């Protein structure tokens, strides 16, 4: 129903934001936000990144006090600091190839494959990925990517 989707897209949602004001006390701040509104990506300066990396080398995790201090020093919000550290830990975990037990079990059963095809895939690979049969004797399902997603194999 297109009438419903138009109304749905224009609806405003209330979000609850917790503002840290000290140990174990929080104030609730309410604000309205459009459903399709997205926060812009944070562009860290070179000096901010250098300082964040330096702090990360000392410890992968920050105390609340250290996060507050770093946020003030770098003129960033505590959330930006927290998310940067979370993303950095996730990036390292992904690069190390560590997977949880469930993911390993699913991979062993052939039920877990989040491989991607590289951007520089040639035109035949692209046609195959788009479901276009190029030779008449194979289908899209006949091709799989390797574990790193570096190439397609038949």
UniProtKB/Swiss-Prot annotation:
Its main location: nucleus. Residues 129-144 have a biased composition (Polar residues). It is found in: Nucleus. Keywords: Developmental protein, DNA-binding, Homeobox, Nucleus. Residues 145-154 have a biased composition (Acidic residues). SMART domains: HOX (SM00389). GO terms for molecular function: DNA-binding transcription factor activity, RNA polymerase II-specific; RNA polymerase II cis-regulatory region sequence-specific DNA binding. Residues 127-154 are annotated as: Disordered. The keyword Methyltransferase does not apply. It comes from the Eukaryota. Gene3D superfamilies: Homeodomain-like. Pfam families: Engrail_1_C_sig (PF10525), Homeodomain (PF00046). One of its GO terms (cellular component) is nucleus. GO terms for biological process: neuron differentiation. Residues 37-96 bind DNA. PANTHER family: HOMEOBOX PROTEIN ENGRAILED (PTHR24341), HOMEOBOX PROTEIN INVECTED (PTHR24341:SF6). Belongs to the engrailed homeobox family. This is Homeobox protein engrailed. It comes from Tripneustes gratilla. The gene is EN.
């Amino acid at each position: 129903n297109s009438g419903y989707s138009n109304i749905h897209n224009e609806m405003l949602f209330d979000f609850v934001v917790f503002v840290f004001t000290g140990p174990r006390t929080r104030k609730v701040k309410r604000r309205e936000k459009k459903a399709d509104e997205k926060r812009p990506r944070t562009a860290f300066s070179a000096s901010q990144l250098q300082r964040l990396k330096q702090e990360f080398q000392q410890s992968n995790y920050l105390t609340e006090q250290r996060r507050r201090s770093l946020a003030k020093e770098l003129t960033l919000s505590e959330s930006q600091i927290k998310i940067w550290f979370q993303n950095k830990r996730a990036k390292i975990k992904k690069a190390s190839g560590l997977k949880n037990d469930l993911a390993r079990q699913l991979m062993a059963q052939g039920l877990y494959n989040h491989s991607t095809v590289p951007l520089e895939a040639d035109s035949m690979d692209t046609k195959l990925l788009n479901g276009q049969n190029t030779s008449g004797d194979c289908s899209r399902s006949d091709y799989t990517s390797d574990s790193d997603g570096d190439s397609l194999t038949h």
